[in-house]
Amino acid sequence: MVALTLALAAATSSAEVLHVRVVDSNQDPVPQVAIYVEQSGTSRAARAPASAVMDQRYKRFVPHILVVQKGAQVSFPNSDVVAHHVYSFSRPNNFVLPLYKGTPPDPVRFDHDGVVTLGCNIHDSMLGYIVVVDSDIFAISNEDGVARLDVDSDAAQWTVHAWSPRFRNTREPLVRTIMAGEALTVTFALEKKLRPSHDDHTESVLWNDYD
């Protein structure tokens, strides 16, 4: 009976594409922004969390920003020839992977939504982020500052969130709300100057953002 109910729910909910664009104060596109959508009023049941990978290559976390659904398990392979000691102080998702090469046998499960800041106890320049969201609809903006997300057409409301370590306020994401019947297009136009990108090797200032 449960399987039949889920099948009927899936059949009555079709997808539409929500377009999100992020631009800075000069109207230039902002890539590598975590975008996720919470929707209400849909008949579709949320998908189960998918596993994900946060690699380490050339003494960098790859990808720099990873978005996962709450409850997802993330593996941390080390593709470098040197050992890494990966950790996060971001409570309640804090964890430690002591000095290792290769791939740890067990992935890390993230059961709480929020931003998880990653570091390496051996290489201080290594900095990465896992954005844990209570949604199965998420993406990263491309080089044009654009993300396209499949949302359920029968939803009554879509709440769109945007987060980047380059935003001046990294504590909370930017939020926009779309109601049923409105255009599925959102532009986040940033008013404040962005922090330098991690490629500039200056983003370590964000270590001070820990609670």
Language-model features, listed with the residues they occupy:
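Short, surface-exposed beta-strand/beta-hairpin micro-motifs centered on an aromatic residue
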Residues: 95, 105-107, 144-151
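A short, amphipathic beta-strand motif
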Residues: 18-24, 35, 76, 145-147
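Short, ordered, surface-exposed loop/turn motifs in non-cytosolic proteins
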Residues: 26-44, 81, 124-126, 154-156
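A short, Gly/Thr-enriched small/hydrophobic beta-strand-prone motif that recurs across taxa
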Residues: 12-25, 194-199
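A short, solvent-exposed loop/turn motif at the edges and junctions
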Residues: 61, 81-96, 123-126, 162-173
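Structured interaction patches on ligand/partner-binding surfaces of diverse proteins
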Residues: 101, 133-141, 166-185
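A short, solvent-exposed beta-strand micro-motif common in secreted/extracellular proteins
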Residues: 35, 73-78, 118, 155-166
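Short, acidic Ser/Thr/Gly-rich low-complexity loop/linker segments typical of extracellular
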Residues: 46-60, 67, 99, 138-144
